[in-house]
Amino acid sequence: MSTKAIYPGTFDPITNGHIDIVTRAASMFDKVVLAIAASPSKKPMFSLDERIALAEQATAHLVNVEVIGFSDLMANFARAQQANILIRGLRAVADFEYEMQLAHMNRHLMPTLESVFLMPCKEWSFISSSLVKEVARHQGDVSHFLPANVHQALLNKLK
């Protein structure tokens, strides 16, 4: 039986922390869908199409990872993808309460949907897309935290 997992997020933009999580998930499951949420209410810096393209480039070396955009409820998307596993990253204890609420709601909506929590390696445990964008807006060097293609796209966006 093959296992298919979904790693959802806004990925605005995708960071090395996200790449760390999806790489480890790809070694655990037969197929991983990197599901990029449209999230218009978050007013993303990058369009959905841009985020998909950046993520596809950054994960091209992972043969069992597919990047797909979505705008539906996660449980509905998981059902449509015939996936029963959600991958979520936990950076700190502060993330846990919110992630637990999401996991319970997703399980209520789709009882067979299990959430699997992965912690990023220590090097990436403090970064978020929001923090990276904020530092970059103030001319801070964020190249260490992003795949090269994403770093260049961020610099271009901020010109």
Swiss-Prot record:
Subcellular location: Cytoplasm
Entries under Pfam families matching the protein: CTP_transf_like
One cellular-component annotation, GO: cytoplasm
Keyword set, alphabetical order: ATP-binding, Coenzyme A biosynthesis, Cytoplasm, Magnesium, Nucleotide-binding, Nucleotidyltransferase, Transferase
Record pathway: Cofactor biosynthesis; coenzyme A biosynthesis; CoA from (R)-pantothenate: step 4/5
Substrates-to-products reaction catalysed: (R)-4'-phosphopantetheine + ATP + H(+) = 3'-dephospho-CoA + diphosphate
Site (described: Transition state stabilizer): 18
Purpose: Reversibly transfers an adenylyl group from ATP to 4'-phosphopantetheine, yielding dephospho-CoA (dPCoA) and pyrophosphate.
Assembly behavior: Homohexamer.
Protein name: Phosphopantetheine adenylyltransferase
Gene that this sequence comes from: coaD
